[in-house]
Amino acid sequence: MRPLVRYRLIPWCLRQAVCQPVSKPIGYRLISTRGGNRSPQGKKTIPLLNKPESSNVGAFPSAHQQLLSLKPITPNDSFISSTVFDSKGAIVAVSKKFQKWEFLRKHALYPRDLRKIDTSSVDIIPSIQVKPNNCIVLNMLHIKALIEKDRVYVFDTVDPSSAVKLGVLMYDLESKLSPKMGTQVQYYEHRALESILINIMSSLEAEFKLHYSICGQILIDLENEVNRDKLRELLIKSKNLTLFYQKSLLIREVLDELLESDDDLASLYLTVKKTEEDDFSDLEMLLETYYTQCDEYVQQAESLIQDIKSTEEIVNIILDANRNSLMLLELKITIYTLGFTVATLVPAFYGMNLKNFIEESYLGFGAVVVFSILSAYLVTRANFKALKSVTKLTMLKSSNPSQASYNMKTNSTLRPALARIRGLFKWRKNPDSNGQPIWNKQDRDVIWKWLMDEKK
């Protein structure tokens, strides 16, 4: 059996392929020389790479290539664009444009629903709006979608980061909605809803891990050193963490409202019609799973926010303590300065170029020095004593609790007796049992007359 290709000619074919550039990216196929295909000279021809019969192959990119290069779009007042999936999970169209009013009329939507599916950069409150026996309008984070019983519309976005997440969602939807996944227990609309919720929870998890790593590292750094730059960074990151907490909290509330309403649960069945009396255990388990996961992110974010607030309070206490220490140091310096000023006041008087009758005294200099030092010491000691009483942080004046309680008991027994004695000497009237003086009618008339004269 002769070889199909002469190996000596392979290098020549490779050189020809390299030297002759191809103008168009066209697919090729191999043609066998078996069956007597010969050249006019009677020799067997070398298999060639010939063009396929169809010239349209490779002319347009596939839907998968478009999803890989999914890009944000420019908003339009007349059209909305979306990627469409059919009942088998296949991509029917990528970034297909629809007229807004025609789209609303076709899917029995109201003009107020246009804001939830419109391609815009405005973030609105997450919602899952159910149109009974018609469709499910979903708006959560970066996903705006419309789910029917045999079709899914995922609307495009203008945010580049959201466009990347939507590209991941497209592949998840395609694999989840495909009938090749095996026996499908869930309905079509529930599979689409679960794929969207999985993407939402994955986005929340990735965002929370980012916030936790950044804020946690800042908190660890602040435990070792209170830095102004770290505090500023913590303030900025705490704002972003608060926004994440609010987003996850709103998503949890949306899922909670769905679980609490049997009417909405019944309306989520589009393939089959169900009422409030039917069993929704499969759908409830689906929603409860992602509700629990979202609640976990809410609790963790709330705990991290509380840690940040506690750290801020501790930092404020430390800063207040440092500020008080600086003020105390300033007061001490002022007290020492005052003592030094008092000490130099008397020598200043003594050094005046005037007669003070002690210039010729042998004890004058020593007396002035001793008097100056003593006066400075007394003034400084008195000021430090006053400062100590001000800075003493106790609830009671006495630092000894037993002594304070004894003083309170003594005061409670001696106070009425002292009040009686004070009343005898002060009022010159016999006091009553409470220590108050007893006034007669004549005394009251004198006091009343005195008050009236004073008003005039």
UniProtKB/Swiss-Prot annotation:
The keyword Magnesium applies. It is found in: Mitochondrion inner membrane. Pfam families: MRS2-like (PF22099). The chain crosses the membrane at residues 326-346, 360-380. It is a multi-pass membrane protein. Signal peptide: none annotated. InterPro entries: MRS2-like (IPR039204). Residues 1-38 form a transit peptide. GO terms for molecular function: cardiolipin binding; magnesium ion transmembrane transporter activity. GO terms for biological process: mitochondrial magnesium ion transmembrane transport. A motif (YGMN) lies at residues 350-353. Disulfide bonds: none annotated. The keyword Nucleotidyltransferase does not apply. Keywords: Ion transport, Magnesium, Membrane, Mitochondrion, Mitochondrion inner membrane, Transit peptide, Transmembrane, Transmembrane helix, Transport. GO terms for cellular component: mitochondrial inner membrane. Belongs to the CorA metal ion transporter (MIT) (TC 1.A.35) family. High-conductance magnesium-selective channel that mediates the influx of magnesium into the mitochondrial matrix. Essential for the splicing of mRNA group II introns in mitochondria by affecting mitochondrial magnesium concentrations, which are critical for group II intron splicing. It also suppresses a variety of mitochondrial intron mutations and its absence may disturb the assembly of mitochondrial membrane complexes. Homopentamer. Forms homooligomers. Interacts with MFM1. This is Mitochondrial inner membrane magnesium transporter MRS2. The lineage of its organism: Eukaryota, Fungi, Dikarya, Ascomycota, Saccharomycotina.
